[in-house]
A protein has these predicted regions:
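Conserved Class I S-adenosyl-L-methionine
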Residues: 175-258
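A short acidic, Gly/Pro-enriched loop at the edge of an enzyme's catalytic core
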Residues: 89-100
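A short glycine-rich, Lys/Arg-flanked "PGG" loop and its adjoining helix->strand segment in the class I
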Residues: 114-128
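Local beta-strand N-terminus motif with an aromatic residue
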Residues: 43, 98-99, 125
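A short SAM/SAH-binding and catalytic strip from SAM-dependent methyltransferases
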Residues: 99-112
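Class I SAM-dependent methyltransferase SAM/SAH-binding core
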Residues: 45-90
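Conserved class I S-adenosyl-L-methionine
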Residues: 1-44, 55, 70-75, 127-160, 185-189
């Protein structure tokens, strides 16, 4: 959304590390999409804050996408609804305009997530659904042993879930999202059981946190993981993940009703 900086001080590149890489590596997984749809319930007129390039819209609903100019909206396919040029903290809609609202993998890009969520709550009379990552769980992923700087960035830039629930108010539930083994949405935990994928630069570039570290970090990660895969060290520690159907890590759905 509006903010293009993370706590580490690096520009968030319009909240895409690399435009083509993000579009090819971040394809919404239908199983995760179903959880979001369930959380939205019967809402039909839905506000999508941080719509970006449009890959996460809910086509079965009347979706109003919102994102700032100069970010991913420029790459939205022409057949998708036109994006409203606005930021979460100052939405150009009257109170209670929408049946529901969602923010998917975007709240950590806002200048002021709490203010943005209060504004989303103001214009939404039904459920507000936020797909995000719980920062306190980010470092539990095995990648932390190979590229701690990347997950440190992820943990710092994601607001605490308790801050999100406080800003939303009302009745709030937080649900951990199981990430499928063959997840199509290429954030780092999507490769929990497919470590070889993270040796591909395009897979890493699909997650903007990698754009905030220098070449030395990326080269060290590549050497370490490649070596552990060749020696069998990774499989001795984490090989059970290769056949685990789903991984419950930091991904959560926050749902709030008035």
């Amino acid at each position: 959304m509006n903010a293009r900086t993370c706590e580490g001080g690096a520009a968030d590149v319009g909240h895409t590390a690399d435009g083509p890489a993000l579009r090819t590596g971040r394809r919404p997984d239908p199983r995760i999409a179903r959880l979001v749809a369930e959380a939205l319930g019967g809402a039909r007129d839905v506000l999508n804050v941080g719509a970006g390039a449009g890959s996460r819209r809910r086509p079965a609903r009347a979706v109003r996408p919102v994102a700032p100019s100069g970010s991913a909206p420029a790459r939205r396919p022409v057949l998708l609804p036109r994006t409203v040029d606005a930021v979460a903290e100052d939405l150009p809609f009257p109170d209670g305009e929408f049946d529901g609202a969602m923010s998917l993998f975007s709240v950590h890009h806002w200048n002021d997530p709490a203010a943005g969520l209060r504004e989303v709550r103001r214009v939404t009379r039904g459920p507000v659904v936020v797909l995000t990552r719980a920062p306190e769980r980010v470092r539990d992923f095995w990648l932390y042993g190979y590229a701690p700087e990347v997950l440190d960035i992820e943990a710092r830039r994601h607001p605490p879930v308790r801050a999100l629930t406080a800003a939303l108010g009302g009745t709030v539930t937080v649900r951990t999202v199981p990430v499928p083994l063959d997840c199509t949405d290429g954030f780092d935990e999507a490769y929990y059981g497919r470590p070889e994928m993270l040796l591909e630069p395009a897979a890493r570039q699909a997650s903007s946190a990698w754009s905030f570290v220098d070449d030395g970090v990326r080269e060290r990660f590549d050497r370490a993981l490649r070596g552990d895969l060749a020696s069998g060290a990774w499989d001795r520690r984490f090989g059970h993940l290769r056949t685990r159907p789903a991984y419950e890590g930091s991904l959560v759905v926050v749902r709030a009703t008035p």
